[in-house]
Amino acid sequence: MAPAKLEITVAVEHAAWKARWPTLKRDISGLIKTAAARAVGDGPASGVVSVVLTDDAALKRFNRQFRGKNKPTNVLSFPDSAEPLGGIAVAYETVFHEASGQKKKFIDHAKHMILHGFLHLLGYDHVVKREARLMEGIETAILTDLGIPNPYLIEKTSA
């Protein structure tokens, strides 16, 4: 299969993202291209992916509007019916606190969340246990290729 042809845009709406991750645009583009080459079997071979790096307030609004949950979350995906694929929004504060609490590197955790969102755009989900195992396996394999430890083996610290 030919590699996926993707148009990838990255918008930074919260300055802390750039301060903590200076190479984010290059890294995110590489991450999505790697993921597409590895996981695109069931999804479109080309499309537009927009990544918005924002804050908890924005993710809380999106989560309330689209999922009926009045709280922030780490990542949301928005499939686009007009263009193949869609958008991914990631909340800085939530990702930062999760990474700290789970003793993960911030950039590694942020990459995992973006990858997770991208796999949702490709049609993967984790509602059913079997599908969750498949999605986690793909995430783990791609992250391992990028030199990032399996995020599911890292234990959360007690609160």
Where does each model-flagged region fall?
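An acidic/histidine-cluster motif and surrounding catalytic segment
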Residues: 1-111, 122-159
